[in-house]
UniProtKB/Swiss-Prot annotation:
This is Histidine decarboxylase. The gene is Hdc. It comes from Mus musculus. Catalyzes the biosynthesis of histamine from histidine. The keyword Lyase applies. It comes from the Eukaryota.
Length: 662
């Protein structure tokens, strides 16, 4: 125990250290655009920086503070950077930070009203504020005479979707037991089926795994939206099979291309068929602060639950997820447990949020949300959304001005998807060139058989200069890729190609071709000082090699198949005419030491036996893939994190260890 005088010294010491940390955070956030966005580290980098065991005696604060830059920052992806475009935003702000600082100091566990009345009541009022700000139906309000619903803060949209599915399952099983009183719940549960689009977030699939409810992923239209016709057809098919439809998860703002499902078509079907309609607006929900963007909410009056993340675009840092339910009693009957030690004198009259969630304990999340709404006001939050949307429009205009690129899906809100015209390997190569420098962070996805790049405007501090700088880096990478592609694969249309002069790797080229419709036609590069794709220190340099799979396909073979088996894998399997043994990222991503040289007289382009040996290593299913297999988005390929000799594991790729092919 500390003596009173020792405690006073301790308190004063950490008061000074707290000010020091606030200054550090201020400096970090104000200069974050100057940092390299992605780290240049490999898995396990941190272990060598730390002792094997915890210290027996206290470390000095100066030593701890110094390790922030020495140990932590070298491995950080800077999500607050204006050059972070990979994922949907995860923003913060000073009011949010200060709110959580206070909440962490109070550190109450607000599972019941009695455990902390302010925690419960502030949350109820703020959730009503937020529902009105977004234009949600009145039945989602706590304080409304005709409402049976209300809102609550959850940790993630993933958890909210699971909660909604569990509540829908419980409600449907109770209705089924009324007709089949002798049936047990497990047999009834086995007949349930839920629906979502094939563009929905992976959390919907995970919710089905946890709840043991079958999930059907339904096809979308040309705009990647789930329509009523597809849902009605699936319901009729499943009823004929003796299944019981129970739940639909509609997405407003899908992960891949920010598409919007048609609530106005799905809602009436759910109402007539008795299905729970859950709406996932994780990213796009913040946009509904702006009345002009609420057209996507048409049909929201049919929703049984709605969720979105203020922790994405609303400048309230993680974790903070808004979740509203139309009928709170259906939620409470799913999660209510009431041991005597959790009861209190006002149990019947007060709201106890422990009955609205999976865990018991809950953080005082509403303080930071309260601070943000009051500090910015609705008008400034709306201006923030409009600014992000305008920056995305500006980037879209830059992409459309360059004939070498295409935009295969309509821009919505702050997300633009684009690709380099031509085979997928070109777009993949552009991403790899960008990743080597680490000056901006982009990730791919696939729509149908096309590899695309997602560009999300994230930071509230993004300027046109930031967008222009990043576009310059993208063009620079594209020029480099196109010049290498044209010089390594001569064709009748490539006769006008101007080869890059020696030593121009990492420098922008004025043009790589002259005229024509070829993707490598003459292109104007917008130059900006101080931004180039110079390779970061310690980065690897894969030598250009002929692709041994090229002759294994006919010219009619889909580009997707070539891309999946050839470009994506072989670039990681070969370096300087040497093959590497590799394993998928589902295993430990540690470079394998065994390398085998190719025979000097072995031709990568000739010899059927060599070709047969290559394909013998792949599952038969891989060779039988159809075009439709690629329509579902492959989300979040984290390109900068690829170890040099590891191949990515995804559903459409061979998920098995790959042996050296010699």
């Amino acid at each position: 125990m500390m003596e009173p005088c020792e405690y006073r010294e301790y308190r004063e010491y950490y008061r000074a250290r707290g000010k020091e940390m606030v200054d550090y955070i201020s400096q970090y956030l104000s200069t974050v655009r100057e940092r390299q966005v992605t780290p240049n580290v490999q898995p396990g980098y941190l272990r060598a920086q730390l002792p094997a065991s915890a210290p027996e005696e206290p470390d000095s604060w100066d030593s701890i503070f110094g390790d922030i830059e020495r140990v932590i920052m070298p491995g950080v992806v800077h999500w607050q950077s204006p050059h972070m475009h990979a994922y949907y935003p995860a923003l913060t702000s000073w009011p949010s930070l200060l709110g959580d600082m206070l909440a962490d100091a109070i550190n109450c566990l607000g599972f019941t009203w009695a455990s902390s009345p302010a925690c419960t009541e502030l949350e109820m009022n703020i959730m009503d504020w937020l529902a009105k700000m977004l234009g949600l139906p009145e039945y989602f309000l706590h304080h409304h005479p005709s409402s049976r619903g209300g809102g609550v803060l959850q940790s993630t949209v993933s958890e909210s979707t699971l909660i909604a599915l569990l509540a829908a399952r419980k409600n449907k099983i109770l209705a089924m037991k009324a007709c089949e009183p002798d049936a047990n719940e497990s047999s009834l549960n086995a007949r349930l089926v839920a629906y979502t689009s094939d563009q929905a977030h992976s959390s919907v699939e995970k919710a089905g795994l946890i709840s043991l409810v079958k999930i059907r992923f339904l096809p979308v239209d040309d705009n990647f939206s789930l329509r009523g016709e597809a849902l009605q057809k699936a319901i009729e098919e499943d009823k004929q099979q003796g299944l019981v439809p129970v739940f639909v998860c509609a997405t407003l703002g899908t992960t891949g291309v920010c598409a919007f499902d048609r609530l106005s078509e799905l809602g009436p079907i759910c109402a007539s068929e008795g299905l729970w309609l859950h709406v996932d607006a994780a990213y796009a929900g913040t946009a509904f602060l702006c009345p002009e963007l609420r057209g996507f909410l048409e049909g929201i009056e049919y929703a049984d639950s709605f969720t979105f993340n203020p922790s994405k675009w609303m400048m309230v840092h993680f974790d903070c997820t808004g979740f509203w339910v139309k009928d709170k009693y259906k939620l409470q009957q799913t999660f209510s447990v009431n041991p005597i030690y959790l009861r209190h004198a006002n149990s019947g009259a007060a709201t106890d949020f422990m009955h609205w969630q999976i865990p018991l304990s809950r953080r005082f999340r509403s303080i930071k949300l309260w601070f943000v709404i009051r500090s910015f006001g609705v008008k400034n939050l709306q201006a923030h959304v409009r600014h992000g949307t305008e920056m995305a429009k500006y980037f879209e205009s830059l992409v459309r001005s360059d004939p070498s690129f295409e935009i295969p899906a309509k821009r919505h809100l702050g997300l633009v998807v684009f690709r380099l015209k031509g085979p997928n390997c070109l777009t993949e190569s552009v991403l790899k060139e960008i990743a080597k420098a680490g000056q901006l962070f982009l990730i791919p996805a696939t729509i149908q058989d096309k590899l695309i790049i997602r560009f999300t405007v994230t930071s509230q501090f993004t300027t046109k200069e930031d967008i222009l700088r990043d576009w310059h880096l993208i063009q620079e990478a594209a020029n480099l890729v196109l010049s290498q592609h044209c010089t390594s694969q001569p064709s009748p249309r490539a006769k006008n190609v101007i080869p890059p002069p020696p030593g121009t790797r990492g420098l922008s080229l004025e043009s790589v071709s002259e005229g024509g419709d070829d993707p490598a036609q003459a292109r104007k590069i917008i130059k900006q000082p101080g931004a180039s794709l110079a390779r970061r220190e310690g980065g690897s340099d894969l030598e250009t090699m002929p692709d041994p799979f090229d002759d294994c396909f006919s010219e009619e073979a889909p580009n997707t198949t070539k891309h999946k088996l050839s470009s994506f894998l072989f670039s990681y399997l070969s370096v300087q005419n040497r093959r590497k043994t590799t394993r998928s990222l589902s295993c430990n991503s540690v470079p394998m030491s065994a390398q085998k040289s190719l025979p000097a007289d072995a031709s990568l382009k000739n010899g059927g036996s060599f070709r047969a040996r290559i394909f013998s290593g792949f599952p038969e299913q891989m060779m039988m893939m159809k075009k439709g297999a690629f329509k579902k988005l492959i989300k979040f390929y984290s390109v900068p994190s690829f170890p040099e000799c590891s191949s990515q594991c995804a559903r459409q790729l061979p998920c098995c260890p790959l042996e050296a092919m010699v």
